[in-house]
Amino acid sequence: MVLYFSPVLTFFLANFFNSKSTTTENLQVFLVENQHRDSKRKINPTFSKKGIEVRQQNENLWSKIVALRFDYSVWGIIQLVLMMGLFFYINSVALIEDLPIDEEFNSVEEFYTAATSAYNQNAYTVGLPVHLCAYASI
């Protein structure tokens, strides 16, 4: 069952973005193509016009999956840069629990000094991989 999790999940994600064919047709083609994993007998696929059309539609599905995964990676970079790096840089109060500082201080000035240095350290730590990736691609 573990072996089928990723292909089946990918199939249903791809089918979600496909509007030209029905789920039943795609599922039948998917199961026929992957049936050799469950049994020792081999199935000879028929090369009908409908089968070729379904295969072409599946190629369109894979291109949509690639685009979806690309969007996820772009969103991850945006989230890393803006939500983490920028908000740590401007000392966002929402991220105070993520700072590696002590919970008790003797004075307010000690707290502000420790919090500011921790914010700056986290901003540089989060921003460093993004800068390395950006400069490595040049």
Swiss-Prot record:
GO terms for cellular component: membrane. It is a single-pass type I membrane protein. It comes from the Eukaryota. Residues 1-24 form the signal peptide. Its main location: membrane. The keyword Transmembrane helix applies. Its EC number is 3.1.-.-. Keywords: Endonuclease, Hydrolase, Membrane, Nuclease, Signal, Transmembrane, Transmembrane helix. It is found in: Membrane. One of its GO terms (molecular function) is RNA endonuclease activity. Residues 25-75 are extracellular. Residues 97-138 are cytoplasmic. The keyword Nuclease applies. Belongs to the RNase K family. This is Ribonuclease kappa-A. It comes from Ceratitis capitata.
